[in-house]
Amino acid sequence: MDKELKALEEFCRRAGCTLTAQERLPNGGLILRVENVDIGPGWNRERATVLFLAPPGYPASKPDCFWIEPGNFRLANGATPQAANDGNPIPGDTVSGRNTTWFSWHVDPWQPGRDTLVKYFQIILSRLKPAR
């Protein structure tokens, strides 16, 4: 996992964002927090903080979904993004009442040993660009 976290940190640095936190959860999962993410045009803000979960059992268990902080993340016209809503918590999160917008976004197929946290973050970026 350390090698993957270093690779994600380097990818973020090159992309102009920052991997700022890795919060270990009691269930064995790990919340990853990436700040200052360029999300492209069409949103109600220019940059975002992205949170995603390396689930218990990762990499055999694939990442699933992601969150934008703070919540109330919307399209520029005020509409709720496709497959998103406010109020769905991060599974196992120890921060009560964390203010996020949840994106139901899934990766298929996932191949442990080949697919990485960098790949999943790239999938998140492809969901955010273009805005929809």
Predicted regions and their residues:
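UBC/E2-like fold recognition across ubiquitin and ubiquitin-like conjugation systems
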Residues: M1-R45, G57-R132
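Short beta-strand-loop-alpha-helix junction that forms the active-site gateway
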Residues: A54
